[in-house]
Amino acid sequence: MASLDNLVARYQRCFNDQSLKNSTIELEIRFQQINFLLFKTVYEALVAQEIPSTISHSIRCIKKVHHENHCREKILPSENLYFKKQPLMFFKFSEPASLGCKVSLAIEQPIRKFILDSSVLVRLKNRTTFRVSELWKIELTIVKQLMGSEVSAKLAAFKTLLFDTPEQQTTKNMMTLINPDDEYLYEIEIEYTGKPESLTAADVIKIKNTVLTLISPNHLMLTAYHQAIEFIASHILSSEILLARIKSGKWGLKRLLPQVKSMTKADYMKFYPPVGYYVTDKADGIRGIAVIQDTQIYVVADQLYSLGTTGIEPLKPTILDGEFMPEKKEFYGFDVIMYEGNLLTQQGFETRIESLSKGIKVLQAFNIKAEMKPFISLTSADPNVLLKNFESIFKKKTRPYSIDGIILVEPGNSYLNTNTFKWKPTWDNTLDFLVRKCPESLNVPEYAPKKGFSLHLLFVGISGELFKKLALNWCPGYTKLFPVTQRNQNYFPVQFQPSDFPLAFLYYHPDTSSFSNIDGKVLEMRCLKREINYVRWEIVKIREDRQQDLKTGGYFGNDFKTAELTWLNYMDPFSFEELAKGPSGMYFAGAKTGIYRAQTALISFIKQEIIQKISHQSWVIDLGIGKGQDLGRYLDAGVRHLVGIDKDQTALAELVYRKFSHATTRQHKHATNIYVLHQDLAEPAKEISEKVHQIYGFPKEGASSIVSNLFIHYLMKNTQQVENLAVLCHKLLQPGGMVWFTTMLGEQVLELLHENRIELNEVWEARENEVVKFAIKRLFKEDILQETGQEIGVLLPFSNGDFYNEYLVNTAFLIKIFKHHGFSLVQKQSFKDWIPEFQNFSKSLYKILTEADKTWTSLFGFICLRKN
């Protein structure tokens, strides 16, 4: 690609080239990213200026001949021109605000008449030419392209629509007469008509900016804004590929900067207690980068804010990250990228923070309202000390801004790799959505209208890779809202569809709302209440500070992962006290020790073998899914839709977290769409079944399979619970559907206790190297296995030495009840039968399998039942 100066010089030389004396030499400026709305904006602006104009109609037929475009131009009503067009050079403006503007130098040379055939491309053109000066004319063209069989089928119809309108076309009525839409292409071109020797590159830039200013009066400011982002990016990114995304405008400031993560309980549990972390407050401002560049001082946020100058003498660059209050022009720094020309991005936060205070002082020296955020280094794991630290930050009343949360910053990593978490009270947990008004006449039952409300759909951004790995689909009406070009990008909008509430993207906007005309805007919203088929959302504010990011075409509100992880705090609220004491209710929080390695591998192998039996099934339900220990096995099996049910909200939140972890770190041949339902399975089957059938897309006939791994002992308290389980499985399964249970076998446990003469409240133990590895505490008196209600305490590998109580599973009684409710027994098998297969699977693990491991494993079994 040539420089603009070189292109202008080449243009001027062409007129002295004798070989081109019979050619038409054209220098044109073309805008390649023009849609109907942009076209209409420029057209109406030029008409309003009453610039002299003419309208012309033509049909151009283009035929490829040896890599050249041979054209027949029919200028209506009768003139025919034959020529070939040859491009010589081009220059493309890099800033995204230029709408793909390209300066093209080409020549047209007359050729002999040629015969048209079916390979030609036909372009019908309705062109309005505005003579803005003696040097330039601006051409706005509505184009319809036809190829192949379309030419004979549609040429006459579109000729009538574009040219033969009921009234004579003028610049003032043409747009109304044609009533153009997505059927057409739209072109804006500027052609130079002055003396070649008078043209300069500055002239080209000036006329280009003239047109762009018609589209956006702030064009020059937007260009400066983008150049400022490029300057920041040049000090953060080393990858030329990523820098190219910034230069092209595909990435804006939000995609460039490391993002603060909404902290869930599962996140916090991974590094609690947060010793070594830094804590500060979350100000209710906007993200901004303060920059000293040469003599200029500015903040890059939702737009470019000039804060002043340093005087005549240029300074070495300083770049600070922080929160900005536009109304007061106040900056509160929380990180530093560069200080007086010294790049700090590879240092840990504990080192960067020292330069942050120095950078703030530089801003203050030029009378800029700037402060460093208050940081406390957490040095104690004592919950009482932690509580005081958090309270001193969150409940401080003397800050000059409102505080809506707490920020935790990880030490030891580079700027881009520093993990920064934010905690907010549930009420202040909000999400940013791109809001679109729902298209009419979709006839989708879930989009039922509500009197006094207008239905809008909520979208967030997602990468193409994550979209595929989560097996997502576009919601009904999507293709009417977003053009094909946007859907084919690597990052695009998708409806907000969290695993526990797939219809959360429906928003009924009150007609009486003070927020009007919200279509196409980014809104900050909070969840007020979850109704049966939609969420009652509340608008907090319109994110005017995100409108510029939206224009890049690479921002659509929160990222999908960020949005769903933030949403988890509605599912599983995270209290302020838990910051100090640690998250409560963490599901089986203890870790397994190394002595369980072989036995755990054996159980995993068996569950993998069982789940492979349902590979590629469409809908599978997991009862008591917990935190998703088997999620990877379902993904490996290629299950298309998985519904996980559990009463533990924290466990389900961890499952959703794992969903993203699997999608980003593991390779699976097939994608699985994951749904979770917070539900106590001891509640009436009818109520549970209704909730499952309300899941968006769940088939009326039911699921293909139900799986429950090591869970049903919780439902063996009484006969009513077992009956309820059988009824539930019958309601949720399609005819011929299968139930797959793994469980501790009550008869095997009782036999073990009898053999070892374990009485009431006594404990059977299996030791390894003097360490209790497995244990069962007898909590019942009866000598024979009862149908239900016999309780034991079990020492689990992840229970940190504590016994978990559960009921013995009388498998004969369980099978009897299921047969009574329309099921047939397919298979019942002990886990010990898989041990020989495990040996073939992994000889190394089999060798370290102890007798205690084998004894413990033999207590478990597998039951398969089929719905008649």
Curated annotation (Swiss-Prot):
Gene3D superfamilies: DNA ligase/mRNA capping enzyme, Vaccinia Virus protein VP39. Pathway: mRNA processing; mRNA capping. The record marks 627, 658, 713, 806 as: mRNA cap binding. Coiled coil: none annotated. The lineage of its organism: Viruses, Varidnaviria, Bamfordvirae, Nucleocytoviricota, Pokkesviricetes. This is mRNA-capping enzyme. Induction: Expressed in the early phase of the viral replicative cycle. It catalyses: a 5'-end triphospho-ribonucleoside in mRNA + H2O = a 5'-end diphospho-ribonucleoside in mRNA + phosphate + H(+); a 5'-end diphospho-ribonucleoside in mRNA + GTP + H(+) = a 5'-end (5'-triphosphoguanosine)-ribonucleoside in mRNA + diphosphate; a 5'-end (5'-triphosphoguanosine)-ribonucleoside in mRNA + S-adenosyl-L-methionine = a 5'-end (N(7)-methyl 5'-triphosphoguanosine)-ribonucleoside in mRNA + S-adenosyl-L-homocysteine. The active site is at 282 (n6-gmp-lysine intermediate). It is found in: Virion. CDD domains: AdoMet_MTases (cd02440). S-adenosyl-L-methionine binds at residues 607, 624, 646, 710-712. In the N-terminal section; belongs to the dsDNA virus mRNA guanylyltransferase family. GO terms for cellular component: virion component. PROSITE patterns: RNA_CAP0_MT. Probably catalyzes the second reaction in the mRNA cap formation pathway. Forms a covalent complex with GTP. It comes from African swine fever virus (strain Badajoz 1971 Vero-adapted) (Ba71V). Keywords: Early protein, GTP-binding, Hydrolase, Methyltransferase, mRNA capping, mRNA processing, Nucleotide-binding, Nucleotidyltransferase, RNA-binding, S-adenosyl-L-methionine, Transferase, Virion. The N-terminus contains the mRNA 5'-triphosphatase domain, the central part contains the mRNA guanylyltransferase, and C-terminus contains the methyltransferase domain. Its EC number is 3.6.1.74, 2.7.7.50, 2.1.1.56. Residues 594-868 form the mRNA cap 0 methyltransferase domain. GO terms for molecular function: GTP binding; mRNA 5'-cap (guanine-N7-)-methyltransferase activity; mRNA 5'-triphosphate monophosphatase activity; mRNA guanylyltransferase activity; polynucleotide 5'-phosphatase activity; RNA binding. InterPro entries: CYTH-like_dom_sf, mRNA_G-N7_MeTrfase_dom, RG7MT1, SAM-dependent_MTases_sf. Part of the viral DNA-directed RNA polymerase that consists of 8 polII-like subunits (RPB1, RPB2, RPB3, RPB5, RPB6, RPB7, RPB9, RPB10), a capping enzyme and a termination factor.
